[in-house]
């Protein structure tokens, strides 16, 4: 009891000292900064600044605040200054004129451990290592040719999902199936076949648990991310212990994967998987970068999390919107079934002919960007945006959700209307700033070309092979569209639907 009270007193004293120092520094900075040179923003509370205004779904809270304070807004999140960009014009200035200044990444407590000290591509600091690893990803791992080489894997896994639905009793949990599809595809592409990790095996089940736990860690807010000086609290609140346990299991699995790929007795598959490619690069003395085993594992964490999460979220949100908009769904089914008539299934080579399906995917990415705030950036140098001075080490949030629902750009922005793209050349590849589901510039998502083919292939086959209904007693207006908090925003309530086989497709 005495030791507990002593710890509480010590904690309180340390916290008060930190608060006092923070206020002194803040006051000193305020005196030297002309208020007219910084962007507008909401009033701050002592110590926490504007943290209380983030809410459970920050992209929504920040959109409301930007409506009041403007598309370029400065906030104070704990001890961290944060800039929020909420319009296409402001995003264009950031990415076109100041992309280098905005190319940094903030330090995150959990990410440092789970990415092997930022050995990944997503959160690595801007610099030589990041440039070389991005080059590897773009040229070796995620090039158009490489993505195309994995077409058979995507085709097989989509067929397995379709067969599972056909055998299942209704309703089917499409959220769970989409996650399983994405996980299976990314694991086969990244690792090939790992002994002992067959479907239904205990080892695979444990890996999936590790994978989901790792995702949860990345999506959880940590006090150290807003008060870096208080990172020591994680030693006492259980976070560091749980983080170490998760990392130990993740590291053990990745070590097994690498060791098996290095085993000379391992049978070689027809296609080089991502681990094979990274080990080949590691062993090439002519490469400009020498990859360590830790670097390889950090890159694999990026590939695993980014590749699976995005595809799952987009596929589920798209199907949910189709269920809420039956006329759109019927039009999409009609297109798929007319064009694919006689084939029995949709192949990737068919996707280019499915024009309406492309519009549906665009509209889904506009209305439900998988990462609505993108991955936060950090300024690496001072710059001026729209006449406002932005200091170095400012955290930057690009509110892709707000940009893509801006009523000044989009008519009836919250309606799901694929037809809006019939007379618009706007795309999602980072060149058009009216919608930025994959970001833009140097730090744009390199895995975009990896996710989109799987989403299109899965969606087209679901529409070809089945007629879809909501569970008995539900109508379109009853379908919940609430978002779950996280870096990637998933549908909070699983999407459960009734699937009836399309007999014409089965006969084909």
UniProtKB/Swiss-Prot annotation:
Residues that coordinate or bind heme: 445
GO terms (BP aspect): alkaloid biosynthetic process
Principal subcellular localization: membrane
GO molecular function: heme binding; iron ion binding; monooxygenase activity; oxidoreductase activity, acting on paired donors, with incorporation or reduction of molecular oxygen
Catalytic activity: beta-colubrine + reduced [NADPH--hemoprotein reductase] + O2 = 11-demethylbrucine + oxidized [NADPH--hemoprotein reductase] + H2O + H(+)
Cofactor: heme
Subcellular location, record wording: Membrane
Transmembrane segments: 5-25
Cleavable signal peptide: none
Iron is among the record's keywords: yes
Protein's pathway: Alkaloid biosynthesis
One GO CC term, this protein: membrane
Pfam families: p450
Membrane topology designation: Single-pass membrane protein
Keywords: Heme, Iron, Membrane, Metal-binding, Monooxygenase, Oxidoreductase, Transmembrane, Transmembrane helix
EC nos: 1.14.14.190
Family matches, as SUPFAM superfamilies: Cytochrome P450
Record's function text: Monooxygenase involved in the biosynthesis of curare monoterpene indole alkaloids (MIAs), natural products such as strychnine, a neurotoxic compound used as a pesticide to control rodents, and its pharmacologically active derivatives, including brucine, used to regulate blood pressure. Curare alkaloids act as animal glycine receptor antagonists. Catalyzes the conversion of beta-colubrine to 11-deMe brucine.
Assigned protein family: Belongs to the cytochrome P450 family.
Name under which the protein is recorded: Strychnine-11-hydroxylase
Source organism: Strychnos nux-vomica (Poison nut)
Name of the coding gene: 11H
């Amino acid at each position: 009891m005495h030791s507990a009270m002593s710890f509480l007193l010590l904690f309180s004293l340390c916290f008060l000292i930190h608060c006092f120092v923070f206020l002194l520094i803040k006051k000193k900075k305020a005196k030297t900064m002309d208020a007219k040179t910084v962007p507008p923003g909401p009033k701050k509370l002592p110590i926490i600044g504007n943290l209380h205004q983030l809410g459970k779904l920050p992209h929504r809270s920040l959109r409301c605040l930007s409506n009041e304070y403007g598309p370029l807004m400065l906030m104070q999140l704990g001890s961290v200054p944060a800039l929020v960009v909420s319009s296409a014009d402001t995003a264009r200035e950031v990415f076109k004129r100041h992309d280098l200044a905005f190319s940094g990444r903030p330090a995150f407590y959990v990410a440092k451990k789970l990415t092997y000290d930022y050995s990944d591509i997503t959160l690595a600091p801007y610099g030589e290592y990041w440039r070389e690893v991005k080059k590897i990803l773009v040229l070796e791992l995620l090039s158009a040719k490489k993505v195309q080489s994995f077409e058979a894997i995507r085709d097989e896994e989509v067929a397995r999902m379709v067969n599972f639905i056909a055998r299942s009793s209704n309703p089917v949990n499409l959220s769970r199936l989409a996650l399983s599809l994405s996980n299976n595809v990314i694991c086969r592409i990244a690792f090939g076949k790992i002994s002992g990790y067959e479907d239904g095996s205990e080892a695979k089940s444990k890996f999936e648990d590790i994978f989901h736990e790792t995702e949860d860690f990345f999506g959880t807010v940590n006090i150290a991310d807003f008060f870096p000086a208080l990172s020591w609290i994680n030693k006492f609140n259980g976070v560091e212990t749980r983080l170490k346990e998760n990392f130990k299991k993740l590291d053990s699995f990745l070590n097994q994967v690498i060791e098996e790929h290095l085993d000379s007795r391992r049978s070689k598959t027809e296609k080089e998987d991502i681990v094979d490619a990274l080990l080949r690069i590691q062993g090439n003395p002519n490469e400009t970068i020498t990859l360590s085993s830790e670097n390889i594992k950090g890159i694999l964490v990026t590939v695993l999390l980014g590749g699976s999460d995005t595809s799952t979220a987009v596929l589920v949100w798209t199907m949910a919107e189709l269920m809420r908009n039956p006329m759109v769904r019927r039009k999409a089914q009609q297109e798929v079934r007319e064009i694919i008539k006689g084939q029995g299934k949709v192949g990737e080579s068919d996707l280019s002919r499915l024009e309406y399906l492309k519009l549906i995917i665009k509209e889904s990415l506009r209305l439900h960007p998988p990462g609505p705030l993108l991955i936060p950036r950090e300024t690496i140098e001072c710059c001026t945006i729209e006449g406002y001075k932005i200091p170095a080490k400012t955290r930057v949030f690009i509110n892709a959700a707000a940009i893509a629902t801006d009523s000044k750009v989009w008519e009836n922005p919250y309606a799901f209307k694929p037809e809006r793209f019939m007379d618009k050349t706007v795309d999602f590849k980072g060149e058009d700033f009216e919608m930025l589901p994959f970001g833009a510039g140097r730090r744009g998502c390199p895995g975009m070309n990896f996710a989109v083919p799987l989403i299109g292939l899965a969606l087209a086959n679901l529409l070809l092979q089945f007629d879809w209904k909501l569970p008995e007693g539900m109508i379109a207006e009853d379908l919940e569209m609430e978002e779950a908090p996280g870096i990637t925003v998933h549908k909070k309530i699983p999407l459960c639907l009734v699937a009836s086989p399309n007999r014409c497709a089965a006969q084909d």
